[in-house]
Amino acid sequence: MIYINNIINFFFKKKNKIEIKKLKIVLNKINFFLGKLKLYSNDELRNKTFSFKRRIKKKTKSLYEKKFGLQKKLIYKNFISIEEMHENKLILSEIEEIKNNIYKEEEKILLELLPEAFAVVKETAKRFKENKQIIVTSNELDYRLSKSRSYLELKGGKTIWNNKWSYMGKELIWNMIHYDVQLMGGIVLHQGKIAEMYTGEGKTLVATLPIYLNALTGKGVHVVTVNEYLAKRDSEWMAPIMEFHGLTVDCIDLYKKNSYLRRKAYEADVTYGTNNEFVFDYLRDNMVYSCKNLIQRELNYAIIDEIDSVLIDEARTPLIISAGVSGQVNSNYYLLKDKVKKLFKKQLYFLNKIFNLSREQIISGNEKEGGLNLFKVYRGLPKYKPLIKFLGEKKNRKILEDTEYYFMQDNNKNMFIVDSDLFFVINEKNNTVEFSEKGINFISEEMNDPNFFILPDIHKKFIDLESLKISKTQKEIIKNELITNYYNKSDKIHTVNQLIKAYTLFYKNIHYLVIDNKVKIVDEQTGRIIEEKRYSDGLHQALEAKENVNIENSSQPLATITLQNYFRMYKKLSGMTGTAETEYEEFIKIYNLDVVIIPTNKPIIRKNYEDILFRTKKEKYNAIINEIIFLSKNEKRPVLVGTTSVEISELISRSLNIRNINNNVLNAKHHKKEAYIIEEAGKSGIVTIATNMAGRGTDIKISDEVKKLGGLAIIGTERHDSRRIDRQLIGRTGRQGDPGSSKFYLSLEDDLMRIFGLDRISTILDKLGHKKGEYLTGGLISNSIQLAQKKIEENNFSIRKRLLEYDSVINEQRKFIYAFRRNALNINLSSYIIYNLVDKIDSKQRFEEFEEELFNIFKIKNLISYNTFLKKKDIKKKLYYKINKYYNIRKNKMLSKLIYIKSYKKFCCKNKKIKSYFTYSINDRIIRLFLKEENNLYKIINNLEKKIILYFIDDKWKTHIHNMEDLRKYSQYSVYEQKDPIIIYKIKAFKLFNNFFYNLNKLSLTFFFNCKINNSLI
């Protein structure tokens, strides 16, 4: 695999050189137009935007006219014939094709406009830098903006644009002009590719180029950032450049969800926002009950900042809108926590005992017995600190490896000897934990149930039940009891499994923090707390139980989607990052996004030293402390220390405090001081300790004095699983040709070294006669670490790819149901629902069964005669028209009742006592609608139909999501039957969706046929 990657990298670099040559040709055209634009007046420069828009409109006019003509042909009425239904389908297909042609035509004209449009943006930036004020003739947008923007003022038909404005409370004087490399980056973004630009190369300014160009179509450009601060900052910082040209700019994170102002933000030409908010707005839009409440426009073009963080690091976690289930705190966590904790402590006690024994055995020369006991400790708790330290000592790692190799022979045939004394076994590479037979027996005894882990064969019990000579009602009661018991037991087993995960795989101050009696997740990529996010599948509740904090109510997902599937819905997608090259293969295969590495504006002079490897963590940390003291005290340089967890950042800080070295700590606990800490981080002699800085958008400024001293020094305390995160840390120094340095300190006890067997380097240290405090460095170490990181990246890619296969199934279902729901918002779907139901009815069954099925759905007898049924000809067509007829009779009956209520209401209004009876009723929803739209009784009935359909879509969809999650979980067991779980999942998911959609249609129609206006109203 690594050999294949080397070939891919070779061709990628070759291709990149060709891409850069092509970009330089376009760059020359931009510079040609820049020469012309210098001669333009301010008004002439501004009028170029209107000229561009006219050209786009002229090119697409005929296509839009054709589209509008087809839209007029669509048939929207309460009753629609089957022929009209098919006609609508053909028209909609043709409209979709025209929309695609419009997009292609717009892309074609935008590509033609690109050199001149980019030149306009650069010339605008230049004029803002070189002039304190730019005076132009006022237009309509100027008048609107003058009410809320301090940087422009109106005087006698003229607008004065100042080059001074504020963002995030800071005042700035515009001083930026696009470099040539930034223009190249802008071209790549417009092409729908990823521009890899090193940290400090001005990606925020680069984005203004494709933003301006693509906003000319009027369809909206979304600029996606990884956090709220960046979304607000960038929108305020860059807005005047676009607003000067008549484009509107806004940020969704400034406003509350579902608000009028957020809707207006989406109507802007350019909309900034965080990835999560864009996704949640999409999900919320598919839960509204009126078109007036829709927030987002059609997804057109998105530019994602830190695209690798959004589409790769966060791709595995779906975003979920859920509702708390009242009173549904899972009591099993309280019931089972103490039992799992007891089991965990028993194993810890046992491992401590046999570890001491194994150490004595190995020291005395009994390597066989000592190796077996050492391997037991490794299988039972691989992160056990005394074990890690012992393995770093002479020959001990070799003893463990030899023992492991022996027991893994013949497909782990003898592994039961090792595991027989353990309660659970941890696989650190796969990050999994499983109960051993001893652990299963322990929990079963604690629960006083020898079959605790065995689920009953419910299918067999149902068969046995049918043979019993009892009434149908009794059978139904027993059946419900069996189902309830089955799910209760299944839930207890699941709870035990989640609790053991919480105790063995998740660590406080690494994976999560406990703040204000709540468990808060720490983002491993950024070191930030992820607010309002919880681990799924009961794991978060297990952690709450473990930490003895309040266990929050369980919740039911109402809507869910992954970032991957949301962003793939945009017509065009592009992104920027300083670290995309390492994930090139994934971007191509999953998103069809090419990566182009943009050259730096100035040569990089940063010194990147080889990694330094120590035997133990203690030796490593001592060396790090000494290096920090030397750099900050002797060389007076600012030092940024990058750590992988809150725990390590606090350890380094305490060690420095003991030596009276002042330091600032930036982690999930101190994130509120972030702005101050970053501002201080570039000053002479300042030491800053931070958890992973990837994706933070931090710009550590250094003075000319610090540049002379050697610039910002980066010290890494450990290599991350991903090379990208390491590169993000390194990228904090050496920006725009500034001096700087980076150095990583490692030990054989680090997770990366242990899990991937790199701690076997200890044998090399032994052969070299390594002494305490000495270290290894050089190409061998760096290459070995890079290979290990590549293995992890490949493994993570495989996991994400597999997860995407699963999510693609429900994604197709989601797209279908959301389209169906959007139609339900806009048109009357009753005829379509009747058609869907009739189409699914089996006309090949016996007449009695056929008639019973019809009655169960429509509650109407004698819909089809026996003779008509026998003929079979056009039976479904006849059925469709007959049901529609009854449906309209039903509507007219309701309508006549409402007419009676209307006249009655006039009388009620004269008498307050009688009016109170009218207002409070079972059918309060109908009355509320009626009071709003009393003059349009047909609209009341149509609204009732719409609300019924939308209610059942939402209600049944959330149940379907839950069922799909269960199916995903249980399909994994098919691997024991030598079957591919994904194939089983796809087959069953198809059946599950068909049943869901059939029931949705059936329930909607049945409800309308049976609902009544309460007689108490009359």
Swiss-Prot record:
Keywords, alphabetical: ATP-binding, Cell inner membrane, Cell membrane, Cytoplasm, Membrane, Nucleotide-binding, Protein transport, Translocase, Translocation, Transport
EC numbers on record: 7.4.2.8
SMART domains: SecA_DEAD, SecA_PP_bind
Name of the top EC class for this enzyme: translocase
Main localization category: membrane
Top-rank taxon, per record: Bacteria
One GO term (biological process): protein transport by the Sec complex
A single GO molecular function term of this UniProt record: protein-exporting ATPase activity
GO cellular component annotations of the record: cell envelope Sec protein transport complex; cytosol; plasma membrane
InterPro entries registered for this protein in UniProt: Helicase_ATP-bd (IPR014001), Helicase_C-like (IPR001650), P-loop_NTPase (IPR027417), SecA (IPR000185), SecA_DEAD (IPR011115), SecA_motor_DEAD (IPR014018), SecA_preprotein_X-link_dom (IPR011130), SecA_SF2_C (IPR044722)
UniProt: ATP binding residues: 182, 200-204, 699
Its membrane topology: Peripheral membrane protein
Catalytic activity entry: ATP + H2O + cellular proteinSide 1 = ADP + phosphate + cellular proteinSide 2
Alphabetical list of Pfam families matching this protein: P-loop_SecA (PF21090), SecA_DEAD (PF07517), SecA_PP_bind (PF01043), SecA_SW (PF07516)
Segments passing through the bilayer: none
Recorded family membership: Belongs to the SecA family.
Oligomer and partners: Monomer and homodimer. Part of the essential Sec protein translocation apparatus which comprises SecA, SecYEG and auxiliary proteins SecDF. Other proteins may also be involved.
Functional note: Part of the Sec protein translocase complex. Interacts with the SecYEG preprotein conducting channel. Has a central role in coupling the hydrolysis of ATP to the transfer of proteins into and across the cell membrane, serving as an ATP-driven molecular motor driving the stepwise translocation of polypeptide chains across the membrane.
Protein name: Protein translocase subunit SecA
Species annotation: Karelsulcia muelleri (strain GWSS)
Lineage summary: Bacteria, Pseudomonadati, Bacteroidota, Flavobacteriia, Flavobacteriales
UniProt gene name: secA
